C-alpha cells in the first residue's frame, strides 16, 4: 500500500464486513459468519471479504450507507449494546429475505462495521504508547508513517471512516446501528463538517444526554448531545422527544442550553399536536433536513426493555413511526440511527425479540423517510 492510502484503501483498513466489528475468537463466530454469508449472498469467508470490498466501491453512488458501531464502552452500568448491530441486521434479514436485493435497488450500501477494540472508546483518552501498541495490532502491514496516523478506538475510527465516506459522496445519508448513544457523536460530528446546509437533530430519548462531561469523560452516552448542541451554536436545532428521566426540569435545559424538548407526558397526551409543533419549530428555524437519532429507551419499556436504561411511561411505537413519516414528508431526513439496543438484557423472556423487532421497524421507517420509498 502507498504511504498515503486512497479513501477506499483506508476504509478497508478501518472497517470490517458487516458483523465483523466484534472481536470474536471462537464463541459467537458461527453466528457472525452466518450473518455475513446471508448479507453478502456468499458461502465462504473469502467471498465475504470480496463482497465487503465491492460494497465499499459502491459508496460513491449510494443514496444511503449502513454502518455498524458495535461499542458500548461509553455506556453506564448495564452493557450489551455492542451486540445491537448484529442482532438488528439478523432480524432484518429474517423479516426481509430479499433485503440484499431490495437494498441494492434502493441505493442502500452496507459498508460494514467499525472494528471495536472492546476496552477502548476514544483516542483522546489514550496514551501515545497505547495508541502505538494498538495500531501495531490492528494495522500490522501498514508502513510506519501511514500507521501512525490511523485511529484505534471505536469513536475515533467511526469519525475518520465517515469523513472518508463524505469525501466519496458528500450527500449520502448515514444510517448507523449502535452501540451505546456515544456512537452518535462521530456521526453528527462528521455531518457537521460535511454539510453546510441548516440541518437539525431530532432525538427520541428518555434522557437528555446533555451533561458537559460525566466523571471527567467528555464524550459518552450522557454527554454527546451537549457537544452536538455546541456544534449548532445552541440555536434550537437540537430537538429532544420523550424526555422523562432527568435530574432537572424542562426549563433548566431549554433555558440554559436553548434546546427544544417535548417531554414524554406531553407526547402521550397530545401525540398529533406534538408532531405538528415539532415540525413547525424546525420549519421556523429554516431546517432543511434532520438526523433522527433514535435511542430505543425513548420508547416505553413495555415495548423496549432490552436496553441499558429502560424507562416506563415513554413513547409509544406508533407515535414514533408517525413522527418519522411526518419528518420525511416535511423537512426531510438526511440520516438516522438506532441506539442502545442491548440484546443480552432480558428483563422478561421476550425482551430481546420484542426490542430488536421494534428496532427493525424503526430502521425500515427511517430508510423509507430518507429515500421516499418503502423498504
Across the structure, where does each feature detected by a protein language model lie?
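Conserved alpha-helical scaffold segments that buttress catalytic/binding sites
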Residues: 2-375
